[in-house]
Amino acid sequence: MEQEDDKQYSREAVFAGRRVSVVGSDARSRGRVPGYASSSLYRESGIISARQLALLQRMLPRLRLEQLFRCEWLQQRLARGLALGREEVRQILLCAAQDDDGWCSELGDRVNLAVPQSMIDWVLLPVYGWWESLLDQAIPGWRLSLVELETQSRQLRVKSEFWSRVAELEPEQAREELARVAKCQARTQEQVAELAGKLETASALAKSAWPNWQRGMATLLASGGLAGFEPIPEVLECLWQPLCRLDDDVGAADAVQAWLHERNLCQAQDHFYWQS
């Protein structure tokens, strides 16, 4: 196992042009928001800051930007709630400069698994989500839809605030638009509640199947060990063996990466290592 350092290196005007866009349900049904609307999903989720987005829009051609928003690497960070840092932005710009439409496949992260939070973000939570999907294959889709519905809900609030502000200037149009927004908000909240209920039921099933999951997380954060998770589901045994050998087996981190990559839980260019 390679021993190395893990080196990490105003709000915009809401009503500019008096145009407020809302992500449509047709886009959400495809599991991805097209074009520049995709930037809204990453921005609203806190994955890309306003400053980072402005830099990327200035430095990248439109095609490259759209490829970035569609790439698995960035969607992986969205699913895990991992914001871009300076090093990630630098990597994007370097890879995008290549004369190759497959440049997104060169994106990856360096992860020190000796850091408990990195172990949680990059291994345990993705693995738990994958394992949950074995209980019900619809779970990943429910989670993605919930994120997008929550983004749409925030955008609807923005639109409602806008029309409330201009009601005195354009009362009739404002009244119509506010009624339309209220109807959309009610429908969105119904969908959010339905998905949340499904996920809560799935979570209860998962807890009964792996009762020591929560205890294991607490133990890991307190002492750095994985023993609190045991006994683990049988399907995870091939992963758990190298995970428990990370601090004394030079090949364990590569075995973890290979297991995750086979199940599309990490990128080919992700590099896991252990440095305590």
Curated annotation (Swiss-Prot):
Disruption phenotype: Absence of ExsD leads to transcription of the type III secretion system (T3SS) regulon derepression. One of its GO terms (biological process) is negative regulation of DNA-templated transcription. It holds the Pfam family ExsD. It comes from the Bacteria. Changing M59R: Complete loss of trimer formation. InterPro entries: ExsD_C (IPR048312), ExsD_dom1 (IPR043101), ExsD_dom2 (IPR043102), ExsD_M (IPR048311), ExsD_N (IPR031835). Can form homotrimer. Interacts with ExsA; this interaction inhibits ExsA activity. Interacts with ExsC; this interaction dissociates the ExsD-ExsA complex. Negative regulator of the type III secretion system regulon. Acts by disrupting transcriptional activator ExsA self-association and DNA-binding activity in absence of inducing signals. Upon host cell contact, this interaction is disrupted by the anti-antiactivator protein ExsC leading to ExsA activation. This is Transcriptional antiactivator ExsD.
